[in-house]
Amino acid sequence: MAKDHAGGPEDLERLVRDLIAEVLEAYPAKAQKKRAKHLSVAGATSEDADASRHRVEMRHVKSNIKSVPGVLTIRGCAYAGSKGVVWGPIKDMVHISHGPVGCGTYSWSQRRNYYTGKTGVDSFVTMQFTTDFQEKDIVFGGDKKLEKTIDEINELFPLSKGITIQSECPIGLIGDDIEAVSKKKNKEINKTIVPVRCEGFRGVSQSLGHHIANDAVRDWIFEQPESEATKAFEPGPYDVNIIGDYNIGGDAWASPILLEEIGLNVIWSGDATLAEMERAPKAKLNLIHCYRSMNYICRYMEEKYSIGWMEYNFFGPTQIEASLRIGKFDETIQANVEKVIAKYRPLVDGILAKYKPRLEGKSVMLYVRPRSAPRRHAYDDLGMVIAGTGYEFAHNDDYKRTGHYVKEGTIYDDVTGYELEKFIEKIRPDLVASGIKEEKYPVQKMGIPFRQMHSWDYSGPYHGYWASPILLDAPWDKPHRASSWKITPAAPWKAASEA
């Protein structure tokens, strides 16, 4: 609909509003009224000085409020935001899923946080640890079981540098004192132990889990006495932290290549250790990739240690160049930036020459986490049109900060599986970039190319100049472009009735 519409902006806006109204008709009146606040139209308001960019007005989009009970939300919980996002990539710490086995099992190794090291010896990212709560633990409390689990981990994995306790819902409901257990075991085994109150019922999405995890980093890492290794670390004038990049598909290995080429030294990144986290306050600048999940700790470090921070985006040539140029240290770094940009210019020209003729003017719909939002720039550089976009757990400021990247189209917040499917059916974009829950398989069944933007779908990295072909190739050339329903034999009962 959006990509083929030849009328003016007013006609397009009317069509999109009609589409939203049509989708909402499936709900009861009360749910319909609530969901209507999350769906809106991005309409042009004025031109920037740069005529190629439009300003859009984010009209009446409500965000960061509770999902409507009974609808199939694509959000996660606070536990997912803490364990799965912020703490999960810290590779030499053991992360205990404290509670029933299910939460840890279903979140086991989903994030594709790549790491160096020997699994089970000095790295534990892909391993699952749980206190396996049973009914008696709910009744009598689980503090003793937690203590025993910590002792077992310390005995079985002596090279682990620390432990985090990721609380599941029952822990908060029964009132277990995980902070007291952490302090006690810290003295006994002399390792960092971090209690994280990330029970899934807290907040409205995984976003509060990010905030809680950031606070745990502040309280149990940064505000503790410095370790001997941190005291011995000698900071340099060009030390930077890469924050909010969780090394999905190797992204955190790709980004430092460019940063080190311009003369910066990365001391904390997505392939992280506890020691790197501890020395993070010694950096000169924080480079934040996922603003929504890690802006809290960046703001704290700015206030406490006077470390500035800036957002960066290594998706697509235009934003890579802008990000390299904005982080100015001195004339030496600035000169290096221009040399690096010139070095990769032939590669960029080759990528644009290969992909732009076949992709320019094609439409793409996005439904992503705020971390994935910058991916739109890779499509923008190729002249693709954003037909619809939205976030799972964004706050109002996320829409305000990123609204100018979206041309006229549909805006959806905390969209349900039903709504997203109906929008895609009606708009029929050339590409959908979203997640794996209620998004990936319905879209592929429609025969629409799909790019999985949460864990890179066994692909990656997507950061850097050389990553563009990895991001752009697969959706267009794989067999799943054909609708699976067209090649699947009819169900036996249908075949019998047709005969």
Curated annotation (Swiss-Prot):
Co-factor requirement: [8Fe-7S] cluster; [7Fe-Mo-9S-C-homocitryl] cluster
Organism annotation: Rhodobacter capsulatus
Record EC number: 1.18.6.1
Classification via InterPro entries: Nase/OxRdtase_comp1, Nase_comp1_asu, Nase_comp1_CS, Nase_Mo-Fe_asu
Functional note: This molybdenum-iron protein is part of the nitrogenase complex that catalyzes the key enzymatic reactions in nitrogen fixation.
Gene3D superfamilies given in the database record: Nitrogenase molybdenum iron protein domain
GO cellular component: a single term: molybdenum-iron nitrogenase complex
Annotated keywords: ATP-binding, Iron, Iron-sulfur, Metal-binding, Molybdenum, Nitrogen fixation, Nucleotide-binding, Oxidoreductase
Class of enzymatic activity (EC top level): oxidoreductase
Molecular function (Gene Ontology), one example: metal ion binding
Cofactor binding note of this UniProt entry: Binds 1 [8Fe-7S] cluster per heterodimer. Binds 1 [7Fe-Mo-9S-C-homocitryl] cluster per subunit.
PANTHER family: NITROGENASE MOLYBDENUM-IRON PROTEIN ALPHA CHAIN
Gene Ontology BP terms: nitrogen fixation
Pfam families: Oxidored_nitro
Binding site for [8Fe-7S] cluster: 77, 103, 169
Ligand binding ([7Fe-Mo-9S-C-homocitryl] cluster): 290, 454
Parts forming coiled coils: none
CDD domains attached to this UniProt entry: Nitrogenase_MoFe_alpha
Name of the protein in its database record: Nitrogenase molybdenum-iron protein alpha chain
Family note: Belongs to the NifD/NifK/NifE/NifN family.
Transmembrane region(s): none
Catalytic activity: N2 + 8 reduced [2Fe-2S]-[ferredoxin] + 16 ATP + 16 H2O = H2 + 8 oxidized [2Fe-2S]-[ferredoxin] + 2 NH4(+) + 16 ADP + 16 phosphate + 6 H(+)
